[in-house]
């Protein structure tokens, strides 16, 4: 099982800055699954360490997290029919090792880290190629 999440640019995987989501293979899949209509299940197989996510779904995940934490007043419940408690718990599991609510700063950092992977993906592709190693 992989350890650190990295993003591929032209299938030339670049080391990610920082240590966001290290050792969190299962947790990133659960967050994607909680936030996106498309399915990104965690199966426990070795191929879970390397996967692709559409940029549209990655953006949707960011927007759903903003909605779940009330950070964007332009997003309403009509935009997303998600289980807010499940989204928040998935965020907690991704960010912390303890089961306690995220602070506003932790949510901001999470969103910034997710945006980093989007910004550093291959601009010509419609998906992010992510891998843990």
Kindly give the residue locations of the regions a language model identified.
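Acidic (Asp/Glu-rich) sequence patches and key acidic residues
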Residues: 1-124, 133
């Amino acid at each position: 099982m992989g350890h650190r999440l990295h993003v591929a640019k032209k299938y030339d995987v670049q080391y990610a800055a920082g240590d966001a989501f290290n050792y969190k293979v299962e947790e990133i899949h659960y967050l994607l699954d909680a936030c996106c209509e498309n399915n990104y299940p965690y199966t426990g197989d070795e191929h879970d360490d390397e996967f692709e996510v559409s940029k549209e779904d990655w953006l949707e995940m960011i927007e759903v997290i903003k909605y779940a934490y009330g950070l964007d007043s332009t997003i309403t419940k009509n935009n997303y029919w998600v289980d807010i408690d499940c989204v928040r718990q998935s965020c907690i599991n991704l960010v912390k090792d303890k089961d306690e609510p995220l602070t506003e700063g932790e949510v901001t950092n999470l969103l910034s880290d997710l945006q980093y992977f989007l910004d550093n993906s291959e601009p010509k592709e419609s998906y992010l190629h992510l891998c843990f190693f």
